[in-house]
């Protein structure tokens, strides 16, 4: 199949940042996706519906003329989030979920939840109102190996949480392990997962063999090839529990290429082509539309998009770097490499 037309996809996990960064990130994402779940880990974080609406206005100011883009907003879950904020989310036109970062798990997560049991009163309201809880699924204890943090989260946090709140609508974001994939498969349909392009296309060898490649460094970290293979299998299976979430995360070249580089891969400019490559490599390109355009919207209870995009099987070289902020550069995922699909 050399050409594929699909309903325009949505990105159910993206980082746009704020301020000057929006000049780069919003057009890149809006040219690819009709909607995006916009992560709230700004400085300071987006903690209320009013703050989310204000952030959305800042995003909309950078949408290119003639492009339809609908940012879907998320609140940042803290130890101090009020149960009453959940009803405001439910009644909001643009806010769809709340995001729980374990404190210290990833970029700008210091304000995250210190102990999930402290916020059970809020989670009870999430379950009652069927507001999705989005989870960065890693424990943050210093003694736990970084490659084991997702599995430990499943055992120590997520299993008890779902026993306590079995009807909770929940997305385990950017899953990276076989254990996470199987966990999601074993749950009822109120539990789903997003998968990034980097975790489908690459594994930890790509990051570590032949020199450290900082632009493959993200959290949760790339895992073994066996885990990568399981993710490919579930993503291309047609199971509606798994859908697209890039976790596209912009950091300047200087912030990535230093002695203590930031975590995050910037995939937004060619995201759907990267996913197409992953699906095509296992001869499942016909399954891409469900994963990219159907299952996320269905889970969130939003209508599927009606406009379409077309991808052609035609080589394109991903740019070596892109302009970012005032005078900095950003290195996109797989920079300088050739991929076999192009959005037209």
UniProtKB/Swiss-Prot annotation:
Q: Where, in this chain's numbering, is substrate bound? A: 15-17, 41, 136, 219, 251, 263
Lineage at the top is: Bacteria, Pseudomonadati, Pseudomonadota, Gammaproteobacteria, Moraxellales
What's the record's note on cofactor binding? Binds 2 Zn(2+) ions per subunit.
Keyword Methyltransferase recorded: no
Cofactor or coenzyme needed: Zn(2+)
- Entry binding sites for Zn(2+) 2: 99, 136, 174
> Is Manganese tagged as a keyword?
no
What is this protein's gene name?
A: pyrC
E.C. no: 3.5.2.3
Protein family (similarity comment): Belongs to the metallo-dependent hydrolases superfamily. DHOase family. Class II DHOase subfamily.
Q: Which organism is it from?
A: Acinetobacter baylyi (strain ATCC 33305 / BD413 / ADP1)
Per UniProt, what is one GO molecular function of this protein?
dihydroorotase activity
Q: What is this protein called?
A: Dihydroorotase
* A Pfam family assignment: Amidohydro_1
Catalyzed reactions per annotation: (S)-dihydroorotate + H2O = N-carbamoyl-L-aspartate + H(+)
């Amino acid at each position: 199949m050399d050409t594929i037309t699909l309903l325009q996809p949505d990105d159910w996990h993206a980082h746009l940042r704020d301020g000057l960064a929006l000049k780069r990130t919003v057009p890149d994402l809006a040219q690819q996706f009709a909607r995006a779940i916009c992560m709230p880990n700004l400085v300071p974080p987006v903690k209320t519906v009013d703050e989310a609406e204000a952030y959305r206005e800042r995003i909309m100011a950078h949408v290119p003329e003639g492009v339809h883009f609908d940012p879907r907003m998320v609140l940042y879950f803290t130890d101090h989030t009020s149960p009453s904020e959940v009803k405001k989310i439910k009644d909001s036109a643009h806010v769809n979920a709340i995001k729980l970062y374990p404190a210290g798990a990833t970029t700008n997560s210091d304000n995250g939840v210190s102990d999930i049991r402290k916020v059970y009163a809020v989670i009870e309201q999430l379950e009652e109102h069927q507001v999705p809880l989005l989870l960065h699924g890693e424990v943050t204890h210093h003694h736990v190996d970084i490659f084991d943090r997702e599995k430990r989260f499943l055992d120590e946090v997520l299993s008890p949480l779902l026993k306590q709140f079995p009807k909770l609508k929940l997305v385990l974001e950017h899953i990276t392990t076989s254990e996470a994939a199987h966990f999601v498969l074993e749950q009822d349909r109120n539990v789903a997962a997003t998968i990034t392009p980097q975790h489908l296309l690459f594994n930890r060898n790509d990051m570590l063999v032949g020199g450290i490649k900082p632009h493959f460094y993200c959290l949760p970290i790339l895992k073994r090839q066996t885990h990568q293979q399981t993710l490919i299998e579930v993503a291309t299976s047609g199971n509606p529990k798994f859908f697209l979430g890039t976790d596209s995360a912009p950091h300047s070249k200087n912030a990535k290429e230093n002695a203590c580089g930031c975590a995050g891969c910037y995939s937004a400019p060619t995201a759907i082509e990267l996913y197409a490559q992953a699906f095509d490599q296992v001869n499942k390109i016909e399954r891409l539309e469900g994963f990219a355009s159907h299952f996320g919207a269905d889970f969130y209870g939003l209508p599927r998009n009606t406009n379409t995009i077309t991808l052609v099987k035609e080589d394109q070289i991903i740019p070596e770097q892109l302009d970012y902020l005032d005078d900095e550069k950003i290195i996109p995922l797989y920079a300088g490499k050739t991929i076999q699909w192009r959005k037209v």
